[in-house]
Amino acid sequence: MATIFSRIVAGEIPCYKVAEDDKFFAFLDINPMVKGHTLVIPKQEVDYIFDLSDNDLAAMQVFAKKVALAIGKAFPCKKVGQAVLGLEVPHAHIHLIPMQSEADMLFSNPKLKLSPDEFTEIASKISAAM
Ligand code: 5GP
């Protein structure tokens, strides 16, 4: 059965898309730690990120870099942090999180509740910065 993230890529489940190329897809995390929290995934369905081939892992990181630079332009911050957990969704993903402090990377923090309009605005600001 397809993962929830493959269903998002296929358009079967809605998302707030940030960017896409032939191999990778970026969209807003639905339970963001901060505004601009974005997920980057390979379209290839792989659970563990370190099971990707060397070439695909490198290409995913280059794609994530473009998205991260755009997040930093759209949401001024000290740096955009990157994290890989993958304990909840069995489809490899990189979290990109604009940080004002180390505390912004604590996954145990309460998540933001944003309206659809806010999500739409955030996604378009990042897309426009790409
Ligand atoms: P992890 O697997 O890295 O522990 O966490 C998975 C992340 O995916 C979480 O931050 C969660 O909010 C996000 N997530 C889970 N399901 C969905 C979904 O259906 N749509 C979006 N946009 N994000 C999701």
Feature map (PLM): residue ranges:
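HIT superfamily nucleotide-processing domains
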Residues: 1-130
